[in-house]
């Protein structure tokens, strides 16, 4: 109909409830372009098809540079097959950042943040994501590709499941090493633990390799990590 809203019906929210009060509406300026960017979350086959057909960007888990580069190349190819340009779709992976003035402090921050993750929880994550029950396996036993059962029919994150299975197929880690992997104790997102300068170098390296177009930052462990991201990493990336 071309009618966006009936001005006579637009009024302040003026909500007052048990948990919060808000006058409304949102006090942010309108987006400066004619069309709001569309972002797809997730990199399953269906998600890639959808993103390559309509999205401006995709947010996905890419725990290593090779996975990110493969995803970006695949999305650009799919976009071109659908009559779009490769540059029409951008890859913005999640980036978990544990930042501190020294590498040792950053590693300590990461360890402290994840210290409460129990072995039972890690075992449950592996079982849920891969269908593999490691409860009775010796710590030093290797987990091989041939040990993996067929993928579970239902998983919380199909992308996470695929990434974890791919890592096992590639690295064949020992049980104790698998249970310490970021994909198991945290998430399958790209992880950087170190100084701001190290983070900048890693980001620039991934960008130069054609693995990313940007990233969605998750500074973790402390407010100092947020400060270091905003005050040192972001300005350095703009140089």
PLM segments and residue spans:
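An alpha-helical appendage that flanks or caps ligand/catalytic pockets
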Residues: 1-32, 66-70, 77-207, 238-239
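Active-site and adjacent substrate-binding regions of carbohydrate-active enzymes
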Residues: 35, 50, 201-204, 218-221
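Conserved, mostly hydrophobic/aromatic
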Residues: 38, 51, 106, 206, ...
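Hydrophobic faces of well-ordered beta-strands that scaffold small-molecule active sites
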Residues: 38-41, 57-60, 89-95, 215-217
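Short helix/loop capping segments that flank catalytic or ligand/cofactor-binding pockets
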Residues: 47-50, 101-102
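A conserved active-site cap/scaffold subdomain adjacent to cofactor or substrate pockets
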Residues: 52-64
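Glycine-rich, proline-tolerant flexible connector loops at the mouths of alpha/beta enzymes
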Residues: 62-65, 218-226
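C-terminal helical cap(s) of enzyme catalytic domains, especially alpha/beta-barrels
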Residues: 70-76, 223-238
